Amino acid sequence: VEYCDMTPAQSQLYSDAISRTRAALRSDAAGAPSRSDRDTSNVLMDLRKAANHPLLFRRLFDEKRINALARDYIRAPEHAEENLQHLREDFAINTDAELSLLARSSPYTAKHVLPAEEWMNSGKVQALKRLIDEVRARGERMLIFSQFTSVLDILCVCLDHMQVPYVGFTGQT
């Protein structure tokens, strides 16, 4: 087990999740109509996501950036017939990681790819980089597991940025 400090972005997301939950619990306790079921039922998942990587949330792709991505996406001939409003709605429910990975898939959207710093902006990724450097210095290899394919998708991009060769296996492989 390796202890990892969260980055400031992770700490903020973690704190926000706790604050949302406290507010929802106070609202429920005060007898207010419960709009907070989503907040209270997903708090543990939000905390896990915050502890893993900030790109598991949508905070960098605001509405303006999603609109620009959708407009560029339909510039590709294979997507020219798609409905712009439907794309905006579809993109709005995706995470920053998913949207950046989508942007990587076409030269029309490549300008929307998040920079390496955003992919590396996780305490766990920084600890993993240090461990990889140590393992490689010894001439050894490593095996990385995650319960979330979305985390593995992020790690693949991070490994690419670190220029670490890898083979990925998921339940979809």
Place the predicted regions along the sequence by residue.
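Inter-lobe connector of SF1/SF2 helicase motors
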Residues: V1-A97
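N-terminal flanking helix/linker immediately upstream of nucleotide/cofactor-binding cores
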Residues: E118-W119, L128-D133
